From Swiss-Prot:
Biological process annotations from GO: proteolysis
Binding residue positions for Zn(2+): 173, 175, 186
Protein name listed in UniProt: UPF0758 protein NWMN_1555
Species of origin: Staphylococcus aureus (strain Newman)
Domain of life, source organism: Bacteria
The MPN domain, residue ranges: 102-224
Length: 228
C-alpha cells in the first residue's frame, strides 16, 4: 500500500502520535526518517527495500553512505539522515552500557557525570550506587534545588541503597556557577552521609562536585581524611 492510499490513522507519523513509537514496525520507523518517496514508490516501499539490503538492523547500522545510496530512492541527504540516526542510537546504547562503568578513581565519576551535569541551571544531587566491585548499578537524582544539609536526608539516600543492594555509594552534585569549591553545606552534608554509611555498612566513597568542565573530589581535597 502506498502512503497516499493509507487512511490518516494508518500513516506512520500519525500512528506514532496516537500509539507511541513502540507501536511502529522497523519499516515504519525508517519510513519516517526517509520522509518522502520517489515517483511510484512511497517511503514505506523504500524502507522495505532498505531493510532487504542488509540481513538485520545491526548490519544496516554498519552501512556506509555509499551503501545506503545504492538503494533506489535513497539520495545523499536521506543517507546522511539515516547515518546520523544510526549513530545517535549507537551513542545512546553506549550511554546505557556506561551506566555500569567501574569506578576506580574520582576522574571516572567526573568523566561519566560532567556531560550531563555541567550545563544544568539548578543544583542536582545524585547518588551513584555501586556493587562490591565498584561497578555502577544505578544512578538516582534524589534532590533538585539549593543544597542544604537539612534537606538532603541520609535516610532517603540509604533506603535507596539498601533497596538496590548497593555495597557503596558516591554522591555527586553540580554547582551551576561553575565554581567547584565545596561550600560549608557541601561539607556538612558529606560528613553526615559518611557517618551514616559507616553505621549501615554502606560506605560513602566520595562526594564529587561538578562545575563547568571541572570537578572537585572531597576525598582528594582531604575532607574524608580529617574525619577518619
Amino acid at each position: 500500500m502506498k502512503i497516499k492510499e493509507m487512511v490518516t490513522s494508518e500513516m506512520p507519523r500519525e500512528r506514532l502520535l496516537s500509539h507511541g513509537a513502540k507501536s511502529l514496525s522497523n519499516t515504519e520507523l525508517l519510513a519516517i526518517l526517509i520522509n518522502t518517496g520517489r515517483k511510484g514508490f512511497s517511503s514505506i516501499d523504500i524502507s522495505n527495500e532498505l531493510l532487504k539490503s542488509a540481513s538485520n538492523l545491526n548490519e544496516l547500522k554498519k552501512s556506509s553512505i555509499n551503501d545506503l545510496i545504492k538503494v533506489k530512492g535513497i539520495g545523499l541527504q536521506k543517507a546522511i539522515t539515516l547515518k546520523a540516526a544510526f549513530e545517535l542510537g549507537e551513542r545512546m546504547g553506549r550511554r546505557a552500557e556506561n551506566n555500569r562503568i567501574k569506578i576506580t578513581q574520582p576522574s571516572d565519576v567526573a568523566d561519566y557525570m560532567i556531560p550531563t551535569m555541567k550545563d544544568l541551571t539548578q543544583e542536582h544531587f545524585v547518588i551513584l550506587l555501586l556493587n562490591s566491585k565498584n561497578v555502577v548499578i544505578k544512578e538516582t537524582c534524589v534532590f533538585k534545588g539549593t543544597l542544604n544539609s537539612s534537606i538532603v536526608h541520609p535516610r532517603e539516600i540509604f533506603s535507596i541503597a539498601v533497596r538496590e543492594n548497593a555495597n557503596a555509594i558516591i554522591a555527586v552534585h553540580n554547582h551551576p556557577s561553575g565554581d567547584v569549591t565545596p561550600s560549608q553545606e557541601d561539607i556538612i552534608t558529606t560528613m553526615r552521609l559518611k557517618e551514616c554509611g559507616l553505621i549501615l555498612g554502606i560506605d560513602l566513597l566520595d562526594h564529587i562536585i561538578i562545575g563547568d568542565n571541572r570537578f572537585t573530589s572531597l576525598v582528594e581535597a582531604g575532607y574524608f581524611d580529617e574525619n577518619d
